[in-house]
Amino acid sequence: MAHLSADKRLVEAFKNNEDIHRATAAEVFGKEKDKVTPNDRRIAKVINFGLMYGMSPFGLAKNLGIGRDEAKNYINKFFARFPGVHEYMDSTRALADRQGYVETTFGRRLWLPEIHAGGARRAAAERAAINAPMQGTAADLIKLSMIAVQKWIEEKGLKSKLILQIHDELIMEVPEDEVDLVKENLPKIMDSVTELPRDQPGVF
């Protein structure tokens, strides 16, 4: 979300390696970061992930066990503090409506045949349009990482094996005498698999 929306506050939080949910809570609730409570952070986490999936005030209210007006207020505060996110969501809906699909940063397309339908079907397509560039780009990145890691294993002639991928994690089986080498190099390989373009915010 931070990369695609190019929202200044979100990008800054990631650059500073901050706890993104705590940083969001501080912005939404108008607190210093060290004053954010566990409940504040919990609410911010639900908002962060919920908005990625196009969660409505009704959905947020149900998820948090609060009133719809209170939930709407949280969402409004979030967009006020992170205007780039709101702009990204609006521009993505418009793009999907215009061309009938969205793309990941790497050009993989999700076609949205329901984007010109009415009611709930269109709403679902709009949610998919907002979410797909984020989730899809993350999926592309982890696949590129798997390819790079396997190539490195083969080039080094290691006995380590790539066993499983879960979300943004790679599970490996590593002989004891290769543990230090893998621990040192795996993060570097995954971090350097590609450089996301930064000159086209909002364009996938």
Placement of each model-derived feature along the sequence:
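Conserved catalytic core of nucleotide polymerization and phosphodiester-bond processing enzymes
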Residues: M1-F204
